């Protein structure tokens, strides 16, 4: 029998319904795995007592035929979703001991379906990073190793703890957030399915804000079917979020395995020109095109002429919004406060923020403050917003001809911890292919599609029209089926 912690969400639900095992046994299997691999630093707060209590309640519900969709399913939560009574820090010293008095809407939605929380996962501080190396709790280590080198690799970021937890079988699924690629890129690096729904599909209420016009909850799973199950539980209109979309949550599970007949897939191959993409990634892209063509899809050449400006636009708009959002951390109402005798209020602000924020967060606050200053706003911020509109228009034009768009998730496989740490510009380019869809607020997923020559997982990205998570899942499922001969599991776990 498969080890309990290696079951997918769908398999776990089936096993619990059939009384093959109890939720308590399932939770204990995950707790054992978490204890065994603490060296990965995937979790920053463990909630084992609560998990076992929730599991006991789930087992009672199964016994009384009252089981809900996710009854007894253990999951992990990125540490920027507020969890009532459970420490929530965004992995920043400025919030290191903050305990919320309310629950985020997304976590509440999962609890309402019977989910069991194992703990809060590590992340880049305030979700600012692509390698999970800016956390105040230290780096997350990927469970994957290259076949020619035993060096520790990054799991991707900013949701690296969630990615490492699911990849190393320390959670059946894990919540992440995706602002410019923070679910999709780690999913690519760790051999997982990572899904970011349409902006507004999942409530942002109770999420610690980075860039409000871009932030969106996402999910890590080990299968496309699991993604559809979790998304159905997570999504929904919320009056507490002014950006929430009042649209019916679709039935998504029927997308899995459905026919690709009459599907048109757009491929912007011009984005791969210029030697930006590693050879293995380019080969995977072409192999996936052939896979979809053989499955019955029509491949259409498209262009996204303004996508090349995505990174530049993102690093104007996102830091500008971050500078505004993070101004609330002043040491007065909650979080860290640095105090000295005879200090003024301004000095307290300065010392608290200097001590509480890490270097990358400070860099982005300074950049955001600069582009919002009166003499720079026209030249940078307003211009970036105009180009953002052009990026969205490019997608609209493409979707007039196709049902979905296919491109790589990241330009490379996972890299060594510290390799790109000293050059922010090179680090920012990790999100080269994920940022454009975020700027347009589109649903997208990363699905494992191949291995590099060094044995590391590579992900393909599928982008859909607004509110069309169904077709994204359909294409992702077809790719998953086409590469089922490849084992996307880290060795030794």
From Swiss-Prot:
Question: What cellular-component terms does GO give this entry?
Answer: glutamyl-tRNA(Gln) amidotransferase complex
Question: Nucleotide-binding: present as a keyword of the record?
Answer: yes
- Give one Pfam hit by family name: Amidase
Please state what class of enzyme this protein is: ligase
The active site of this protein is located at: 78, 158, 182
Which NCBIfam families does UniProt cross-reference here?
Answer: gatA
Report quaternary structure and partners.
Answer: Heterotrimer of A, B and C subunits.
Entry's family note: Belongs to the amidase family. GatA subfamily.
What name does the UniProt record give this protein?
Glutamyl-tRNA(Gln) amidotransferase subunit A
Query: Which species is this record about?
Result: Rickettsia prowazekii (strain Madrid E)
Q: What is the lineage of its organism?
A: Bacteria, Pseudomonadati, Pseudomonadota, Alphaproteobacteria, Rickettsiales
